[in-house]
């Protein structure tokens, strides 16, 4: 495999890298080498994933070699004379040793992406590289990995998760019980790179649970964020992810149904039916627990009833403190929330069993309440000022809900107002409500990630531009940034702004014009004329579903729909998840016909966000308008207000209007990225809205698109565009090689029927120039995994605990960080480039974590899993009036230490420090024993405190505890 020297690192690449790939890999290596953060944009089709893997693994391999040489050198060093040699001689060696304490081993690389299918594609790319000898383990959710037939019969992610927890807790899952005895089986520990399907097959063959087997392997390799490189691929929506996963909603009907469920459980207990269902097995909760919880929920319901909504249509906004006041009235506090969440989880498991024997809900409302408490009380008390600035509570009137309640009326059942009564209830507080707890600061979550002392964070995607607003919102220091051009030549892409249709009617999809019949007709005629010219697949993206439906209805009535259908069959993006797969299969089948097909979809939909329309599947894309967020949407209004209130010259945040415009353009960039998927692809991009010529809109498009539009883009007349477009495809078909049949004839095997998030691009392995190897179609071997693209929710349990350190007035210590981030991630962990089966060998990890009730013992959730906490550096008051602080410089630290202790003590300290590098827990205990023996006296205890920064992350909590007990 060819080797290229990039930024001083030898990188093995499957072929000679293109200039854009070299530039990209240079930026990645600079980030890893310097321990800085990067924001890197490289258009889809430029080999971004392959470049990420090869550059990061090449740096890891080089770093590993350097580390091994250092270890050999230190092992040969003779420290028998520590304390008795030439002045300063031994100190320099010890200083070097302590200097490497901040980086005891080779940093790991966590490669994270949005969906399971994207991670599967990354694993396929890894198999193509010279770094494919890495052992691997795939970490997926239960949807992908569970093989228990009864659990898999459950509908919904939450039900599957809870049923799995129940069976593990009750020891009725034979697959999970075999994991411990077979976790070291060669099929699991071998060097072969496994994807999700491979792991499932191994689990079925060994009759063990793939889900828990993969987590055993993860625990064996101690995944921690300290000194780790985090690469977030497909990060174009990272701000929204940070905001949405820190937000939560609870409805009056949810509270009412929770009360009803508790009442039903109490009745079952009272009647003795629970004994019939569970036999003599003791319950995890008592009637007193149920009574207390019901009283608290009744108080919460009363508190929600008392909230006055001034505007029953748009709702009313309150400060974030209102949520804590509301829960406080029901006695939900920081002191008892953990025990309440634990009780809720036990009730969910109880209802799962009960629902199999009687008609009863499975505890979904308990899960909702648990999510609410987990997210709201994840914001620690000492950072409330930042919480109040970053969050808002917005209360809406809940329509047509039936359930528990006290109101009566002709159109009411169980207390909830029916449709038509909301307006009349505006002046009343006792109506069903929706309580939204919204986060508007994405930097709130990113700051927590940085405070874990990761070595680097790299955000990358095909559509990140413009970069400055993204960096400003995330509030992370960025040393490396890149906007790559596309890998294709100018002649392979045709980009034009179409301002008028064939009838010279202006094309502008703004609010004032979208209902204009002349505009709708002109847009249809434009699509008809383009469909006559474009070969194979034509994609048409609309700003919204209502606009799509409006155009379809008008064209069907006027006959335009039939005219377009005569040229190419038309497919509409279905809103139903179940219909999506069949629709896509039919579209790909139509592409195989000579006429091709038209696919009409919406920006931000499944098609625009994830699918791959390479080669014949997508020869042109039409953008019919700018998909601005709903202007009157309460969340949009509050986001704009937040930006205006917090914008300063220093933080360079966008104004509310700039953010509003950018949100639309980013959705356009993502839709455009469905075509031009590789080096030999070609296609046309037609922007059918005259507003695209505005400088403010052009500057927000991806850099490679701006290059085709020029400095001062103008709307082109329709006639010349038709002639140019016809000539473009004539030249392209003559000069570009035909796509391989494997790229167009493959079925859509990676599309899931129950998609939650937009589908990932259908992975295709291309034959690159300079390579004689022939690769099988990725689609032909695509993995069929149920819900492979769904994204599990998570709760940011430690946002504020990390971010709040600055609010306390003290900057966080450089080495004071958590060992784990409680958030949903998908990752590949690159630890080592050897195929050794020894404990020091590396591991590749792909995993996604899901939100689940945070209390079950086997759960990976926050309450049960969190083992570490952020702590401030221990402060010890010396006997003197002026507090002493250990020197920051290593050499100065050692000189002062040697001046304070005896020669024998200093020699023992030096030897213990060197042995500590072996990484065993026993060596830490030996070092602690010497430290406590030598430095526990009040006059020198400040030196003991100063040693904390040189300890490994996993030992700091015990160090704090033992020093705190002095």
From Swiss-Prot:
One of its GO terms (molecular function) is ATP binding. PANTHER family: DNA REPAIR DEAD HELICASE RAD3/XP-D SUBFAMILY MEMBER, REGULATOR OF TELOMERE ELONGATION HELICASE 1. Its EC number is 5.6.2.-. It comes from the Eukaryota. A motif (DEAH box) lies at residues 233-236. One of its GO terms (cellular component) is nucleus. PROSITE patterns: HELICASE_ATP_BIND_2. It is found in: Nucleus. It catalyses: ATP + H2O = ADP + phosphate + H(+). NCBIfam families: rad3 (TIGR00604). Belongs to the helicase family. RAD3/XPD subfamily. [4Fe-4S] cluster binds at residues 146, 164, 173, 209. ATP binds at residues 42-49. Residues 844-864 are annotated as: Disordered. SMART domains: DEXDc2 (SM00488), HELICc2 (SM00491). InterPro entries: ATP-dep_Helicase_C, DinG/Rad3-like, Helic_SF1/SF2_ATP-bd_DinG/Rad3, Helicase-like_DEXD_c2, HHD_RTEL1, P-loop_NTPase, RAD3-like_helicase_DEAD, Rad3/Chl1-like. The lineage of its organism: Eukaryota, Metazoa, Ecdysozoa, Arthropoda, Hexapoda. GO terms for biological process: DNA recombination; DNA repair; DNA replication; negative regulation of DNA recombination; negative regulation of t-circle formation; regulation of double-strand break repair via homologous recombination; telomeric loop disassembly. This is Regulator of telomere elongation helicase 1 homolog. It is an enzyme of class 5 (isomerase). It comes from Drosophila sechellia (Fruit fly). Residues 7-284 form the Helicase ATP-binding domain.
């Amino acid at each position: 495999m060819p080797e290229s020297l990039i930024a001083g690192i030898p990188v093995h690449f499957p072929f000679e890298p293109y200039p854009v790939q070299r530039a990209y890999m240079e930026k990645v290596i600079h980030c890893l080498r310097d321990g800085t953060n990067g924001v890197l944009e490289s258009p889809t089709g430029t080999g971004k994933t392959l470049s990420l893997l090869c550059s990061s693994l090449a740096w890891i391999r080089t770093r590993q070699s350097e580390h091994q040489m250092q270890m050999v050198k230190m092992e040969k060093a003779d420290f028998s004379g520590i304390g008795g040699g030439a002045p300063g001689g031994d100190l320099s060696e010890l200083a070097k040793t302590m200097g490497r304490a901040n980086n005891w081993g080779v940093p790991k690389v966590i490669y994270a992406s949005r969906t399971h299918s994207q991670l599967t594609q990354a694993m396929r790319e890894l198999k193509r590289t010279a770094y494919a000898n890495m052992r691997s383990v795939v970490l997926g959710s239960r949807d992908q990995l569970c093989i228990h037939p009864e659990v898999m019969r459950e509908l919904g992610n939450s039900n599957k998760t809870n049923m799995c927890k129940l069976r593990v807790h009750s020891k009725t899952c034979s697959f999970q019980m075999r994991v411990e005895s077979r976790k070291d089986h060669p099929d699991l520990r071998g060097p072969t790179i496994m994807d999700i399907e491979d792991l499932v097959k191994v689990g079925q063959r060994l009759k063990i649970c793939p889900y828990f087997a993969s987590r055993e392997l993860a625990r064996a390799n101690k995944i921690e964020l300290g000194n780790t490189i985090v690469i977030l691929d497909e990060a174009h929506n990272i701000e929204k992810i940070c905001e949405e996963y820190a937000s939560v909603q609870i409805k009056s009907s949810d509270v009412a149904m929770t009360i009803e469920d508790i009442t039903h459980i109490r009745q079952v207990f009272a009647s003795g039916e629970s004994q019939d269902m569970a036999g003599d097995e003791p319950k995890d909760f008592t009637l007193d627990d149920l009574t207390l919880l019901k009283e608290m929920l009744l108080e919460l319901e009363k508190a929600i009833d008392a909230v006055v909504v001034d505007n029953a249509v748009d709702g009313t906004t309150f400060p974030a403190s209102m949520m804590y006041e509301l829960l406080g009235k029901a006695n939900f506090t920081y002191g008892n929330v953990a025990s309440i969440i634990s009780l809720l989880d036990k009730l969910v498991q109880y209802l799962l069993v009960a629902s199999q024997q009687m008609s009863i809900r499975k505890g979904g409302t308990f899960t909702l309440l648990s999510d609410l408490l987990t997210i709201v009380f994840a914001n620690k008390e000492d950072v409330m000022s930042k919480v109040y600035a970053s969050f808002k509570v917005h209360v809406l009137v809940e329509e047509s809900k039936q359930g528990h309640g006290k109101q009566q009326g002709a159109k009411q059942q169980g207390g909830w107002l029916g449709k038509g009564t909301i307006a009349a209830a505006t002046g009343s507080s006792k109506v069903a409500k929706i309580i939204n707890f919204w986060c508007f600061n994405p930097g709130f979550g990113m700051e927590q990630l940085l405070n874990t002392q990761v070595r680097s964070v790299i955000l990358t995607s095909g559509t990140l531009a413009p970069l400055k607003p993204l960096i400003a919102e995330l509030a992370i220091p960025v040393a490396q940034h890149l906007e790559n051009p596309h890998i294709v030549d100018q002649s392979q892409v045709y980009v034009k702004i179409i301002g008028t249709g064939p009838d010279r009617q202006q094309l502008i999809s703004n609010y004032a014009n979208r209902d204009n019949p002349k505009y709708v007709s002109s847009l249809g005629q434009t699509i008809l004329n383009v469909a006559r010219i474009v070969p194979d697949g034509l994609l048409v993206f609309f700003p919204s579903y209502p606009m799509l439906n409006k155009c379809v209805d008008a064209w069907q009535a006027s006959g335009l729909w039939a005219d377009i259908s005569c040229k190419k069959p038309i497919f509409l993006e279905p809103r139903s998840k179940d219909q999506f797969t069949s629709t896509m299969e039919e579209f790909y089948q139509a592409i195989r016909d000579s006429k091709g097909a038209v696919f009409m979809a919406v920006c931000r939909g499944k098609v625009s966000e994830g699918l791959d329309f390479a080669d014949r599947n997508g020869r042109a894309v039409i953008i019919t308008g700018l998909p601005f967020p709903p202007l009157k949407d309460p969340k949009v209004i509050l986001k704009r207000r937040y930006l205006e209130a917090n914008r300063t010259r220093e933080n360079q945040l966008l104004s509310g209007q700039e953010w509003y415009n950018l949100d639309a353009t980013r959705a356009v960039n993502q839709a455009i990225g469905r075509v031009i998927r590789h080096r030999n692809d070609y296609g046309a991009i037609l922007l059918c809205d005259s507003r695209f010529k505005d400088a403010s809109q052009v500057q927000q498009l991806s850099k490679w698109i701006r290059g085709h539009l020029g400095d001062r883009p103008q709307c082109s007349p329709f006639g010349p565009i038709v002639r140019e477009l016809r000539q473009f495809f004539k030249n392209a078909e003559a000069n570009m090689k035909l796509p391989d049949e494997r790229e167009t004839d493959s079925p859509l095997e990676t599309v899931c029927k129950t998609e939650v998030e937009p589908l990932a691009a259908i992975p295709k392995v291309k034959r690159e120039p300079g390579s004689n190897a022939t690769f099988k179609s990725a689609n032909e071997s695509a993995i069929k995994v149920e819900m492979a693209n769904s994204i599990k929710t998570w709760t940011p349990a430690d946002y504020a605990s990390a971010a709040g350190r600055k609010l306390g007035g003290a900057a966080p210590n450089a080495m004071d960080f958590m060992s784990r981030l409680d958030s949903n991630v998908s990752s590949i962990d690159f630890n080592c480039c050897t195929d050794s089966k020894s404990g020091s060998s590396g591991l590749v990890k792909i995993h996604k974590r899901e939100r689940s009730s945070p209390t079950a013992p086997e759960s990976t959730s926050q309450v049960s899993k969190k083992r570490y906490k952020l702590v401030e550096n221990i402060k010890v008051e010396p006997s003197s009036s002026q507090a002493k602080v250990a020197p920051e410089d290593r050499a100065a630290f050692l000189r002062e230490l040697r001046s304070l202790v005896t020669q024998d003590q200093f020699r023992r300290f030096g030897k213990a420090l060197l042995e500590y590098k072996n990484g065993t827990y026993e060596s830490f205990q030996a070092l602690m024993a010497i430290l406590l023996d030598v430095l526990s006296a009040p006059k020198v205890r400040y030196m003991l405190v100063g040693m904390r920064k040189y300890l490994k992350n996993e030992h700091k909590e015990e160090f704090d505890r033992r020093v705190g007990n002095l």
